[in-house]
């Protein structure tokens, strides 16, 4: 589904990604973790072309992302992306936020988009807030709206870039519960997160990054049980002891 091959990227003279290679199979959940500045958010943004790469290749469902001929807006309509900050339209109601992409990109009628949007809001537990505006909702509720909005486009896979890091601690669980449910339903997911409980529960594999490199790429049992690198061991001892 997602193939990342020898990907390198620079910001000016600073190399942010170095020769990264991995893949995510259909139905697989892969968690990407690592210290701040390790390149994990940059890597996931490269997957749908939000960040260009200078070297290597990324293929999503048979489409080469870094090919100049690739229609990136079309590709992104099939790849759901949920960010740290919710990126909702503040001047639109919740249901309007879910309908606009379906109508403008997928060509659905307003009625179809509304019906699909309401089903998804029900699924993430906020159907009762459909006519409210984003500013009237908590951070956790807004992030659940963002997930529902991504799902409304019927994506073939979902990318999450630290979806809980901007939330108050008590709101994190409500977002993770939705993500766990998605994973259990077989959605292909690539998730940048520090939530190791989530990784232990639903990840098939864990990728650990440091200084722009993939240091570990292992089944979760192996990663949590016996990571190969000293750097991953240090990271886990710090993050799991707090």
Listing of model-derived features with the role each one plays in the protein:
Residues 1-220:
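ABC family nucleotide-binding domain
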Residues 211, 221-242:
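C-terminal boundary and immediately downstream tail of ABC-type ATPase nucleotide-binding domains
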């Amino acid at each position: 589904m997602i193939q990342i091959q020898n990907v390198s990227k620079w910001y000016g003279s600073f190399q942010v990604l170095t020769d990264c290679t991995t893949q995510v199979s259909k139905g697989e959940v892969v968690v990407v973790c690592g210290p701040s500045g390790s390149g994990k958010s940059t890597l996931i943004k490269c997957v749908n072309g939000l960040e260009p790469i200078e070297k290597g290749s990324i293929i999503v469902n048979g489409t080469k992302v870094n090919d100049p001929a690739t229609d990136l807006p079309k590709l992104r309509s099939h790849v759901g992306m949920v960010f740290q900050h919710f990126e909702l339209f503040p001047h639109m109601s919740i249901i309007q936020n879910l309908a606009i992409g379906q109508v403008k990109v997928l060509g659905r009628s307003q009625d179809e988009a509304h019906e699909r949007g309401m089903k998804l809001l029900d699924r993430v537990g906020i159907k009762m807030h459909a006519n409210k505006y984003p500013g009237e909702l908590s951070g956790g509720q807004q992030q659940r709206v963002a997930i529902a909005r991504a799902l409304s486009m019927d994506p073939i896979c979902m990318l999450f870039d630290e979806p809980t890091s901007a939330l108050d601690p008590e709101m994190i669980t409500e977002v993770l519960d939705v993500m766990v449910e998605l994973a259990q339903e077989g959605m292909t997911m690539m998730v940048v997160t520090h939530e190791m409980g989530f990784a232990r529960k639903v990840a098939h594999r864990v990728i650990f990054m440091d200084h722009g490199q993939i240091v570990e790429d292992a089944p979760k049992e192996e990663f949590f049980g016996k990571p190969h690198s000293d750097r991953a061991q240090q990271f886990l001892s710090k993050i799991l002891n707090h």
